[in-house]
Every structure is written in structure tokens, then in C-alpha cells.
């Protein structure tokens, strides 16, 4: 950056001196040089300051934001680079309460997300895409152990016990399309908060329409046409290969059931239908 400014300054100085050659009465070479220098500095003092300011502004890091969202800044973030998207539900009464929580603090400390999707479909952006929001907490997905550093966090205004509004899901799909396109995130890389932390999180709830999302091209869904898993297929190894942490197998099975079977009441193990689903997912 300093080299560019030096080059431009020398060019401006040279041009100014050339334009002033031959004017005025004869003087010694040294005095002419001093007068020319003074003239140049007077002529270019303010334009040069402006030029330097503009160049510095152009080279500065720019926060990445979505054109679909209302910017409502949260101070709770750091810098990072996203490769995956984590979906949450807010488990709060309304979007204003969620905005307060995501911009200040809650009983467990400061939290934030990049986006919040209201029940009416309005999208709020709280943290720039290139910044590290504090939404995932401890957990793991596949080989990723710091999900905050690797992900975009999207909170969805929902109390956890009600279906998600159609306008809200439509807005979410538009947002996913925008974010995946701009940040070059693979469209299959959309997971639940409960997927990465099954022992402590259950969001989004069983009411979340994962199949609808997959039909729109985001996330993954098993093919209905796929038959049973082959003999010898190990569903637990498959669950781990898919990305789920197995520190607590019962919790991992529960998170899987919630996402792919829409159930919270199944036994905390993996049955033949789970094996079929996992085999289908891993073969895609």
C-alpha cells in the first residue's frame, strides 16, 4: 500500500514540476527547485490527502452483508470464514425479545447470530457474514470442532412447540440462496444446532420442514425410492460418517430422529429405518 502511494506521489510531483518549468524570471537551479516544491505542495496538499483517504478506504476490510436483510448490528462477534450454515430456533416469545437477546446478553452470557428470520418473513442481519458470531457454542460436526469459526448462524423466530410460518420458511429459503451464492457455501452444508450439540440442544424443533428445504435445494434428504440398507451396514458408523458426534449415542440418535423422522418419541437407538435413511444419505 505504501509503495503505491509513493509511486502516485512521485508521479503527481513530476507532473506538477513539468507544468511549472520555464515560467517566471530566471533563477538559480536550487531556488527554482525550492519554489517548484512549494508550489506543488500548495497545489496538491488537499487533493493528495483526499487521494490517500480514498485509497485507504478502498483497501480496508469491508463487512459482508446481505441485501435481503435489515442491518441491526450486534457487538458480539469476531472475524472468521464460513463453510457451513447452522439453523436454530429462538425459543422466545417474539422477534423483538430475540433481537434484544442477540444484541445484549442472556443468562448464559453473550450470544449472537448472523441472521434472524421473523415469523412474518422479515430478515434481520446482526453480524456481518465475514465476522464470527457466537451462536453455536461447544460441539462438533464431522471434523469441525469450532463451529462458530466455520459457520453462518441463522436464528428462526419460533417458540419450539409450534409449526414454522410459511412466510418464514419462504424467506429462509431466499436467504439461504443468497448466502450460499455470495459466500460459495455448498448447499448441502445446512445443519441443525442439535446436530452439532445433540446432548444439550434440540433446535430447530421436530416441526422444522427439512424435507421442504431439501426440495428447494438446501440440506439433504433421503430418497424415498432407496431400499433397505445392505447386510452388514453399521448405522452408528454411518451416523458418525455423516457428521454426528457420538460422545452421547442416545442424544445423537434423538437429534437424528428429530431431523430426519420428525419424531421426539422414538427409542434412543438406531433401527432398520434409520439405517435405510443413513445409507440413502451417504450414497448421495
Task: Please annotate each region the language model reported.
Residues 59-62, 165-284:
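Basic/polar, cationic surfaces and motifs that engage anionic cell-wall
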Residues 7, 16, 28-30:
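Ala/Thr-enriched low-complexity intrinsically disordered regions
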Residues 38-48:
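Bacterial N-terminal signal peptides that target proteins for export
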Residues 6, 14, 37-38:
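Intrinsic-disorder-associated, low-complexity terminal segments enriched in Asp/Asn/His/Tyr and depleted
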Residues 62-78, 83-84, 91-188:
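Active-site-adjacent loop/helix surface patches within enzyme catalytic domains
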